[in-house]
């Protein structure tokens, strides 16, 4: 939620044909996927701060800049805002400019004590023109800059942050310190980009990936001052601190659409590579599974007596899939918790509990808070994450990175498959370590996992046109139901979520066994129902029961869309539409059956003319509670 960009460069660099405004606007475009409702920029030039801001998309801001240009500069900041305090208006957009027009501030997060601070600042004679907590933070910073910090912007930021409560990232520039940006972070993302004769700040590396792949992750409660020649990090008290350098593993081209109409469509097609890259490098020369990233003592992992998977949204459904596999392979009781519920229900967690978190961005605030709570109770935490340099891996005991590459579309696709793959690897590793499975059994499952990338490609090649046609035909549906059993149940939940997110229509996923306990009342003539059918080569009773469920809804007038593996003839008599996927063991099926549901949701949204990559009201990275 919200995107932040900062740039400082030398005034004269050979062969450089861009200025601060170019860098900042490009960074904001790269960060659009995070979700926003207004945008703004500010630069320091000729001893003054110049700024523009506009409700709406970055394109609206660019149109404003065409009619009202800003001066060239080598220092600037930019922001895309997701409204929390105050509506999405020009006045509430960032940057907020105070101190007689000399100080510009952008902010991501929520200042929880802003009302108290605002009252105090009103007492000092300051006035406010917006409804935002950001203007309060900016005014406090300006007040301290002039009255307590001897006009030292870094010191003023340190003193300001000591007064603020909540989660925030702040970037500030001042006309009287025209060579630097000062930034702070607490429980909100901020990454430093390191160039030659220029340096950058961003909510994530997408904000500066066009210019450098060298980055530095900051810790919590830190402040950084960047100039053209370097950066310096302190804590909020002014003590010297260090960041952790890393190199971004992908380039700007990976964050382009690459010929596809939508980022989501591209990312659906990148899923074979996402699974393959998540598997890569996690086996020794003999083929044995080795997870070197798990910096947790083996004796500790052997003593685990409970696993809790913590996540939100799509990642939580990946966790539900993983639960079936982990319990089956490891024989360890496994729970799946929504992060925002976990913290508030007094969960039973101790030193024999292993917490596994799933987060694509690594910045999901509810999940981050759950990590801290779990560790306070003595649990070990393993993060499964797609973003290097993010907060959740840094605060966990170990991390398995999914290596899925940048996921730009708000609705998650390839991260979901990569998360399932990574949790499967973790489950197999624990089973191997604890002696729950023989080596040949582990190798057999790994062999099946290695076939998944090609099978996902086969799904894409085999059913994409069929599913897109179905989506076009069903674009006027007002409600769609999804049914599944066993691992097909969380797939049904994910299919429903995708349709809600993208097509803005009622969609619900149910455990098929619950039909007669209530949901069957929703079935009427013409009701579309997707059914995920388990392999007939698995538990016969499971397959037979799902076929029976198809018969039940079909008999009541439902339009049945069945996802079944090749060769499963039992469904043909009861399906209006059959989407065929390659044969795979039951636990592998979610990695295949999910793909047509992603294509369907994308197709319905496109047919309705909706923004596929940036659905209304949604943000890619939910960085506030």
From Swiss-Prot:
Catalytic activity field: D-fructose 6-phosphate + L-glutamine = D-glucosamine 6-phosphate + L-glutamate
Name of this chain's protein: Glutamine--fructose-6-phosphate aminotransferase [isomerizing]
Pfam families, per the entry: GATase_6 (PF13522), SIS (PF01380)
Compartments, record wording: Cytoplasm
MF-aspect GO terms: carbohydrate derivative binding; glutamine-fructose-6-phosphate transaminase (isomerizing) activity
Keyword Transmembrane: no
Organism, as annotated: Corynebacterium diphtheriae (strain ATCC 700971 / NCTC 13129 / Biotype gravis)
Domain of life of the source: Bacteria
